[in-house]
């Protein structure tokens, strides 16, 4: 639906610097993997006691206004808000013959939280996938090409619904910033190399490249879907990316020589 107000980008040729915080829906919202609650791929790990149960988590789903107020007081200008696929396309079962319906109330709930984010002067940066997926996809969802299609359907439905509600219900412009996948390199390595994330695969390193390929294909699919939607609706061009984890390993390679040289340089190691 076309809006009646100006959705054009700022005439400025440079993007503003954003200073903010980042969240994951599963890690902060609460309300997952309990009785009668949506299940994601950590459900079995929680039941087996290999990780703590989610429980109420940080209660973001009910106390988001307090978090936004705290961010505003700290002078932040952005809030990276993670959407939980398992809430948006939920099932209390861990095995299904077909994907379940999308929960429009959940999508409306996320829209309301994004609108509240903006009311507090925070630019929303929306993460569409942060390590977790619905349990009905199986533990090793990213080893199958079908997950690319399922992810595309999720992205298309979610982005279209939330933005149209932002425009029609809240009289706000569409979302400008998206992260399709949070740290896909860590998702793969923690699942198939270090074993920190749940998996049923016995292939180990043999699962790494198939999972990478499917995740990158899913990113491209999401990128194109979002841009195509915005173009067809006449919305301002969005910024869509993924973020990867990188680390400076100086400490593991050089720090010992720094410590050994302290005495030579008359520096107190304390």
Predicted regions and their residues:
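Active-site region of glycoside hydrolase catalytic domains
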Residues: 2-44, 48, 93, 115-270
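Alpha-helical protein-protein interaction elements
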Residues: 9-11, 34, 53-56, 77, ...
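A common structural microfeature
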Residues: 16-18, 61, 78
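Aromatic- and Gly/Pro-rich amphipathic surface segment
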Residues: 38-74
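Glycine-/proline-rich flexible loop or hinge segments
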Residues: 45-56, 86-98, 139
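Glycine-rich anion/phosphate-binding loops
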Residues: 55-65, 99-112, 145-160
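Aromatic-lined substrate-binding rim segments of carbohydrate-active enzymes
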Residues: 66-132, 226
């Amino acid at each position: 639906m076309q809006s009646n107000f100006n959705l054009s980008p700022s005439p400025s040729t440079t993007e503003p610097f954003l200073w903010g915080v980042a969240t994951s829906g599963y890690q902060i919202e609460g309300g997952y993997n309990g009785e009668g609650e949506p299940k994601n791929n950590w459900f079995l790990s929680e039941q087996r006691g290999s990780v703590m149960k989610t429980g109420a988590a940080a209660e973001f789903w009910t106390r988001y206004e307090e978090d936004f107020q705290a961010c505003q007081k700290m002078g932040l200008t952005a809030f990276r808000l993670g959407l939980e696929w398992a809430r948006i396309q939920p099932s209390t079962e861990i095995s299904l013959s077909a994907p379940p319906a999308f929960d429009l109330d959940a999508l409306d709930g996320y829209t309301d939280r994004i609108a509240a984010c903006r009311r507090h002067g925070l630019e929303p940066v929306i993460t569409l996938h942060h390590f977790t997926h619905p349990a009905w996809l199986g533990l090793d969802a990213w080893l199958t090409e079908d997950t690319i299609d399922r992810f595309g359907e999720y992205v298309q439905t979610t982005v279209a619904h939330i933005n149209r509600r932002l425009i029609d219900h809240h009289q706000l412009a569409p979302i400008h910033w998206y992260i399709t996948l949070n740290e896909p390199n860590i998702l793969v390595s923690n699942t198939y190399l270090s074993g920190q994330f749940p998996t049923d695969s016995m292939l180990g390193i043999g699962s790494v490249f198939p999972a990478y390929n499917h995740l990158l294909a899913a990113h491209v699919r999401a990128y194109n879907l979002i841009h195509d939607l915005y173009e067809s609706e006449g919305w301002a061009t969005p910024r869509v990316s993924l973020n990867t984890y990188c680390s400076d390993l100086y400490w593991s390679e050089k720090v010992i020589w720094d410590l050994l040289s302290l005495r030579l340089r008359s520096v107190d190691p304390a």
